Amino acid sequence: MGQPEFIEQTSRRLIENDIAERTRIHQSEIARFQAAQDGARTLKVKSRNTPYTMLAQGDSWFDYPLTGNTLPYARTDVIAQLGKMGSTPPKILNLAHHGDAATEEMSLPKQERMITALRDRANWLHGKPDAILFSAGGNDIAGNQFCIFLDFNDGHSTGLNADRFNKALGIVEACYLALFALRDRLAPGVPVFSHCYDFPIPNGVSPWCIGPWLKPSIDFCNWTVPQGKAIVHDALVAFRVMLKRLESDAANNFHVVETQGILKPADWANELHPHPAGFKKIAQKFATALGHKLQKRVPYEAPVA
């Protein structure tokens, strides 16, 4: 076995072990709530508020293992923040992994992992999750491949090549549709919630271990940082339009959490990721959207700005 194959297999085992540990912790928490409910029924007393249970799949916005750009290693992402919100915080089985593109999130192994999770009743209080949370699309565009979607600045081009970018969005859209189809088979009626990221600054800032993701392509295609910021803005607006089109089809049972324009420049740790306080702002938007849409009970308190 060559070194690349060894590294890949080792990385895969680490991810599988991490997901298994997350699942073990999640199931132990669900079992405690189930036991409390059973005890309340036996004693014929009112049970305390029952938390929502949710399945999360996604990228680094749902699985960010850094504090900004530095140590300590600590999950500060949207799911970590959301799991601490409200008088009865939701219990979220998080299958997300940083760095995953939408095509990876909906690849055969990841779909099989979601199917296993959805079928395991030990993960849910009512046989299936109350919601599925999905973060996908950013890694399909950002990175060394970002230059594919840019015109070279020869003094006449406008920046984002809409034709090439829309073709990439078509692949991302197909991944969302694949998720809806999987949900319809395994957990019919469960709503899917996603988000549209926010407008980053392509300034080359990144953690020590990875990145940058945007400025190298901006430089390669002869654009300035202010011009690059406008290009990234246009790309994310187009991404949101695609998501809103999916949301407009009631059959998709899909809800877009409006996250664009929320973060201030100081909220960004690097080109793609907020500081913990920025992730908390995004999580608060999820909490509000979930509270509005899941009307059978409202375990969330109003988020604090």
Write out the residue ranges for each language-model feature.
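A structural motif corresponding to the C-terminal end of an alpha-helix
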Residues: 85-87, 171-191, 234-257
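Hydrophobic, aromatic-enriched interface-forming segments
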Residues: 168-214
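Short amphipathic alpha-helices and their capping/turn segments at secondary-structure boundaries
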Residues: 37-48, 108-132, 177-189, 245
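Substrate-gating cap/lid alpha-helix
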Residues: 202-255
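Histidine-centered active-site loop/cap adjacent to the catalytic His
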Residues: 267-305
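A solvent-exposed, charged loop/short amphipathic helix patch at secondary-structure junctions
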Residues: 143-169, 207-230
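Conserved SGNH/GDSL esterase-like catalytic core that processes O-acyl groups on lipids
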Residues: 61-162
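N-terminal secretory targeting modules
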Residues: 1-57, 61-80, 84-87, 298-305
